[in-house]
């Protein structure tokens, strides 16, 4: 080995090669396609992975500031397009690509990010969660949108035209750009924190997918999902569907449509109130008419036309009770008298005059009621006795004999048939006004 030969250190060789990479115009900006490999997500820091194809592999690094601009989440095996520079990493002596931009190969980065977030939130149930109903008559409506855009003007104009008593409060926010998503979510939280709103509208006008992208950010979607106020989303045109639209309680195609969903038409409300008033009045009239018909029907029923039918079944029981009343009347009177004496003695001891008078009045009422009841029972029983005597008189044998009937006795025994008689036997014939003696001369036993 020649002594004149100069040996390089590993460091010197590595630094020489590194400078070659840095000054090579073809390696300063490389457009590369490959498949993501060995990717392990590292939140809030630099990302390390590899890019490979069927025959080769290259290490890749993407610094935190560059990765923050990536709209989708890289996945193992995903084909991507990257832009970066090739450099040499001195400690290992290996070359790698420093990725500055990255997007999916074949599908736009924003679309890929949209689909990934949509799938994630759907799995968490944010799209299928129960939707909060919109209040029918909101008093205060919060609007999160740009201060200078046409959205707030359309909402205010539509609300004043339809329901002028509602108050619109603007929570101004950027609606496009990198800082817009965080500001939109903060304003949603502010509107909820105030606690005196009925409805929340978020939105912006139409634009490209990049312009609408803040409404596809996860931070905005979660702010909408956590809102205690019902949220109406009006982002872009009718054909645009953002993540915010899917999470919101109601989606509106335009800001004007959002205002129309938020408030009713004042004149329609008045008309509805008048119709409801008429309906209630008619219902009341029908109710009164039905009750009047029922009352008329009741007035013609036997309860009023033949009231005696109500107590006919109780007359017999009343007779029995009258008898018991007659028997108990004196006992009740005696008990009442004894009670009166006791009360009178107590009152004499207590000496309140009004209590004595009250007791005397009660006793007098009891005596009058007892006397009336006793007299009524006596009259009823006297009538019953008269009717019974008349019935017995009609059945009396003497009464029957006055009509020409008589009966025969033999030896002071009533003769019931010819078998009790003998020829030549003397019998007595009893008639209404006396009796006569007769002798049996012939007995005929025929029918």
Curated annotation (Swiss-Prot):
Provide a GO CC annotation, any one: exodeoxyribonuclease VII complex
Q: Sorted alphabetically, which InterPro entries does this protein's record hold?
A: Exonuc_VII_L, Exonuc_VII_lsu_C, OB-fold_nuc-bd_dom
Superkingdom in the source lineage: Bacteria
User: Where the protein is mainly located, per its record?
Assistant: cytoplasm
Q: What Pfam families does the record tag this protein with?
A: Exonuc_VII_L (PF02601), tRNA_anti_2 (PF13742)
What EC number is given for this enzyme? 3.1.11.6
Which transformation does this protein catalyse, written as a reaction? Answer: Exonucleolytic cleavage in either 5'- to 3'- or 3'- to 5'-direction to yield nucleoside 5'-phosphates
Q: Which GO terms describe its biological process?
A: DNA catabolic process
Q: Which HAMAP family match?
A: Exonuc_7_L
* Similarity comment text for this entry: Belongs to the XseA family.
Q: What's the stated role of this polypeptide?
A: Bidirectionally degrades single-stranded DNA into large acid-insoluble oligonucleotides, which are then degraded further into small acid-soluble oligonucleotides.
Protein name (record) = Exodeoxyribonuclease 7 large subunit
Q: Which organism is it from?
A: Lactiplantibacillus plantarum (strain ATCC BAA-793 / NCIMB 8826 / WCFS1)
> What is the taxonomic lineage of the source species?
Bacteria, Bacillati, Bacillota, Bacilli, Lactobacillales
Gene label: xseA
């Amino acid at each position: 080995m020649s002594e004149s030969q100069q040996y390089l250190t590993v460091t010197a060789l590595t630094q020489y090669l590194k400078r070659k990479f840095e000054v090579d115009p073809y390696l300063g900006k490389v457009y590369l396609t490959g498949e993501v490999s060995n990717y392990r997500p590292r939140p809030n820091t630099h990302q390390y992975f590899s890019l490979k194809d069927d025959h080769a592999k290259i290490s890749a690094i993407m610094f935190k500031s560059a990765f923050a601009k990536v709209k989708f989440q890289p996945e193992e095996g995903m084909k991507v397009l990257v832009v970066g520079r090739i450099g040499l990493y001195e400690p290992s002596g290996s070359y790698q690509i420093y990725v500055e931009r990255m997007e999916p190969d074949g599908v736009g980065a924003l679309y890929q990010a949209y689909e990934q977030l949509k799938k994630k939130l759907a799995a968490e149930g944010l799209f299928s969660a129960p939707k909060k109903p919109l209040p029918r008559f909101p008093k205060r409506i919060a609007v999160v949108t740009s201060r200078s855009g046409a959205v707030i003007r359309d909402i205010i104009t539509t609300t004043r035209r339809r329901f002028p008593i509602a108050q619109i409060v603007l929570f101004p926010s950027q609606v496009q750009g990198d800082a817009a998503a965080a500001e939109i979510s903060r304003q949603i939280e502010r509107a909820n924190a105030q606690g005196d709103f009925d409805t929340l509208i978020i939105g912006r006008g139409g634009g490209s997918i990049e312009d609408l992208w803040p409404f596809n950010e996860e931070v905005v979607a979660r702010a909408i999902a956590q809102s205690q106020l019902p949220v109406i989303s009006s982002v872009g045109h009718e054909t645009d569907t953002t993540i915010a639209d899917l999470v919101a309680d109601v989606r509106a195609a335009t800001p004007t449509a959002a205002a129309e969903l938020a408030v009713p038409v004042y004149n329609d409300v008045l008309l509805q109130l008048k119709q409801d008033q008429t309906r209630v009045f008619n219902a009341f009239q029908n109710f009164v008419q039905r009750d009047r018909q029922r009352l008329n029907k009741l007035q013609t029923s036997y309860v009023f036309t033949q009231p005696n039918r109500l107590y006919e079944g109780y007359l017999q029981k009343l007779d029995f009770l009258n008898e018991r009343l007659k028997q108990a009347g004196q006992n009740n009177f005696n008990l009442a008298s004894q009670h009166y004496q006791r009360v009178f003695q107590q009152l004499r001891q207590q000496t309140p005059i009004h209590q004595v008078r009250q007791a005397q009045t009660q006793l007098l009422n009891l005596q009058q009621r007892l006397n009336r009841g006793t007299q009524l029972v006596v009259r009823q029983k006297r009538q019953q006795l008269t009717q019974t005597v008349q019935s017995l008189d009609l059945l009396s044998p003497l009464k029957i004999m006055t009509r020409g009937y008589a009966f025969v006795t033999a030896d002071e025994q009533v003769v019931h048939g010819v078998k009790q008689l003998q020829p030549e036997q003397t019998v007595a014939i009893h008639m209404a006004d006396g009796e006569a003696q007769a002798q049996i001369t012939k007995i005929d036993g025929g029918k």
